[in-house]
Amino acid sequence: MTLANKTLTILIALFPLALFAQEEKDSAGITFSGSIESNIHIPKYDEAIETEHYDDWAMTNTYANFDMESRYVDAGARFEFLKHPLPGYEEGFRGWGVPYYYIKGKMKCAELTLGTFYEQFGSGLTLRSYEERSLGIDNSILGARLVLNPLKGMIIKALTGKQRRYWGHSDALLTGVDAQQTFPLTRSLDDNHPSLTLGASYVNIHHPSQETLEGEKLKRNVNLFSLRSTLNIAPVTLYAEYAHKSNDPSATNGYQGGSGKAYIFSAKYEKDNFSLLLRTKRTENLLARSERTQTGLAARVNFMPSFSEFYADYDLSSSFPAPQPESEQAYQAKMTYNFPEGTMLGGKYGTSLTLNFSHARSLHKDEGGTYYQDISAIIDKKINEAFSLKFLYINQIYNATVLDDGDEKVHNNIFITDATYEFNERLSLNADLEYLTSTYYEGDWLYGKLSLTVSPHWTFSVSDEWNCGETKTHYWYGEVEFSAGSHELSVGYGRVSEAYICVDGLCRLDPSMKGLFVSYNYEF
């Protein structure tokens, strides 16, 4: 019997506990909740933008979550249908079933979960198990997790299980423990009072088979540990973390092996109208997987946070500054100042200014140099009661040799104007105009979008993305969005250009597409 079957059998056996809890409704307070998310694409071939030919007349990523909560017992499951997945997702995710299910027992100072769960230790340098549907990431753990709160300010976590890999699970067994203690520097543990938080984590990856490389046996156990601390003395917050990984030859590091390490330092100042963030990190051979031969986004045990700024609301600002866990030194400095109302620069309604500098490079001068650099300025200004403006300038450098399949360093300049006019409480119009100058082979791009919102239910938008450099191709698109209560529905038709979708420093490539796009979300 597989681990999944064993766990499912246990859940079925324990589920009557949840039903029994209904008899204690007055004291237990049972609640049911869930959600449905369905994204559908009906493709149409377009030779002009080189869309792919698909065997499926329609493709969808559909998810349905069901959860029950009570005073002592929680339970839930998620159904997924990706038998015909959306373009750009890894082929391994093709399938359907119930990969996520759990039952959780809760007491005053303890919590035990059996089944599937997500977890993160610290910033994720030793363990980050999470779901990111836009990228096709789900590295949940099937097994058991215990969370203890024995003392005020103390959290202890212990877990064991196997990591999800597409529709199965990796052979390696993960075992980990994390401990964190917050010490008040005054008599209060309130978030606004000075405090010192110390944490430590340990993760073991046990590979059951004795793999060999060039005749040499690889060690079955890979160990990761980290130490971290947070000092909070308002308005200053300081954070530091160090992580270490034992010898781990894998496809990620070219089976070179050797130990890995990383550190993160950050300092944040935030008071009144001013905030400043300074941080740096260094990573070397730290990425660990539950399958040594795996590449791509699957079977990742830990996580390398990105120190690059993301401008997710804007079309032409997307790039792919994915952290390089084998060799990277990164820095970021970000400042925000809100000019007060009634001042010369603040005007009647105030003005916000944000400046950012991000830089990531190789640890070795002969291995790629600069990976990515971002210098940006954002001005957000409300002109009057009805009209507001936002201006962005972004200067980017990215190394296409390292981050993409190119062979050059690409220089981008991006200019964005975002304007919103509110005619009344129900009707508003948003205009987004973007221009990208680039040394990339396709050259410059121009993007424009108009969105009319009729509150509380409707939004109508039209856009065009035009390659005014090499191809002269237009990517026009129209969309209608409707929302009512817990329901959200959007229907769009048109062309979508090839682009990288990035979240938290991890990316996947979305191919050029044309056709009908439908998205539906419901929460209950």
Task: Please tell me what each predicted stretch does.
Residues 24-31, 36, 40-59, 68-69, ...:
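Signature for the C-terminal beta-barrel architecture of outer-membrane proteins
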Residues 485, 492-494:
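Long, intrinsically disordered, low-complexity segments
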Residues 100:
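Phosphate/ribose-recognition catalytic cores of enzymes acting on nucleotide-derived substrates
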Residues 103-125, 129-150:
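Well-ordered mid-protein domain cores that form the structural environment of catalytic cofactors
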Residues 1-31, 524:
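Bacterial Sec-dependent N-terminal signal peptides
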Residues 63:
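Catalytic domains of carbohydrate-active enzymes, especially glycoside hydrolases
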